[in-house]
Amino acid sequence: MSSQYSNVENLSPQTIRQVMRELQEMETTPPEGIKVLINESDVTDIQALIDGPAGTPYAAGVFRVKLTLNKDFPQTPPKAYFLTKIFHPNVAANGEICVNTLKKDWKPDLGIKHILLTIKCLLIVPNPESALNEEAGKMLLERYDDYSQRARMMTEIHAQPAKCGVGASGDAKDDDGPSTKKHAGLDKKLQDKKKEKLLKEKKRMLKRL
């Protein structure tokens, strides 16, 4: 997943142009809650920020995802990963995402936008029947409140917008201007200490779960 290996040289010029065109369209007119991060030197390395949907345990989080195009794309689906740690039935320990769109339901005319929207939908409606994280799948089916609490806690620890710099909406997070810092420096230090203490406590709770 973290490999620097690229398949650019194995993709046809037509496929590269098609992918680049779609990414640029998404950058100009982004889907709600999704911000694509274009790597112009390697179109096979596609990353995006997805806002956690409201009303889910992932709300208020920002999740970085990665799509890896193989040499046979679009005849074969890309692999998809969460780079941000997440507690979800359809996400493996290494971040790999399991969704039918990227397996038996794949069609060559499904684009990057469709894949990212499908991943966002997976945050709203997980599929515990095809779980890669069996613990999360079982917990969702049998003890939803515990599942929701665990997923929320992971979101608060690992998916805070400050870790990504911006949210998928494009708004800067925790980026105070010089004048703000001048007047609020002490308050910010106190808040940071409180946040750090809270995160440590949550991590201890996670270990006990």
From Swiss-Prot:
Nuclease keyword on record: no
Molecular functions (GO terms): ATP binding; ubiquitin conjugating enzyme activity
Catalytically driven reaction(s): S-ubiquitinyl-[E1 ubiquitin-activating enzyme]-L-cysteine + [E2 ubiquitin-conjugating enzyme]-L-cysteine = [E1 ubiquitin-activating enzyme]-L-cysteine + S-ubiquitinyl-[E2 ubiquitin-conjugating enzyme]-L-cysteine
InterPro entries, per the entry: Ub_conjugating_enzyme (IPR050113), UBQ-conjugat_E2_core (IPR000608), UBQ-conjugating_AS (IPR023313), UBQ-conjugating_enzyme/RWD (IPR016135)
Ranges of Basic and acidic residues composition bias in the record: 171-199
Keywords: ATP-binding, Cell cycle, Cell division, Nucleotide-binding, Transferase, Ubl conjugation pathway
Known EC number: 2.3.2.23
UniProt-annotated stretches for the region Disordered: 164-209
Residue spans of biased composition, Basic residues class: 200-209
Pathway: Protein modification; protein ubiquitination
UBC core domain residues: 14-160
One of the protein's GO biological processes: anaphase-promoting complex-dependent catabolic process
Active site, UniProt feature: 98 (glycyl thioester intermediate)
Described function: Catalyzes the covalent attachment of ubiquitin to other proteins. Acts as an essential factor of the anaphase promoting complex/cyclosome (APC/C), a cell cycle-regulated ubiquitin ligase that controls progression through mitosis. Acts by specifically elongating polyubiquitin chains initiated by the E2 enzyme vih/UbcH10 on APC/C substrates, enhancing the degradation of APC/C substrates by the proteasome and promoting mitotic exit.
Family: Belongs to the ubiquitin-conjugating enzyme family.
Protein name according to UniProt: Ubiquitin-conjugating enzyme E2 S
Organism: Drosophila yakuba
Lineage: Eukaryota, Metazoa, Ecdysozoa, Arthropoda, Hexapoda
